[in-house]
């Protein structure tokens, strides 16, 4: 089942997921808020001048790299690759649809956790304390955070909150994948 299915049973199942995925997103947000500050620590790069984006990935190894880079990128790349199969094959394998669906359902809550945690522990303190290290630093961090919004959008497509029909849902799914890839690459370039 994916956004390509048009049966009323599929629409009902998609809508039925809205509440559980919403609860999962709220729980992820609470966890992101309550986690100890993962933006500070020691790492092999101590003393080097770098953006906060790269600094975040360098401290608390390997956990920050896994939480803030590996998990979101694996989910997004899975979505991108399965999206190509779904768009270009007239009858894609069921496992591709299922993989895309599960990655789409998980991506939103993961990014809610990441966004809440980084807004609380990085963006607000850096902004209020004047801690930004120049324009590249701001661009890297903010585009990374903005890249989370399309992944949340994909989850909303998967639960039926966005997309009036299968074609519209497919369109939004593809748009969100593309927007994520652009924003994530801008973050990496400036990071």
Each model region followed by its residue ranges:
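Membrane-interfacial hairpin junctions
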Residues: 126-130
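Membrane-interfacial catalytic/cofactor-binding modules of polytopic membrane enzymes
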Residues: 131-139
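Hydrophobic cores of alpha-helical transmembrane segments in multi-pass integral membrane proteins
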Residues: 19-37, 41-49, 53, 61-87, ...
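Amphipathic, cytosolic membrane-interfacial segments at TM-TM junctions
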Residues: 90-99, 166-168
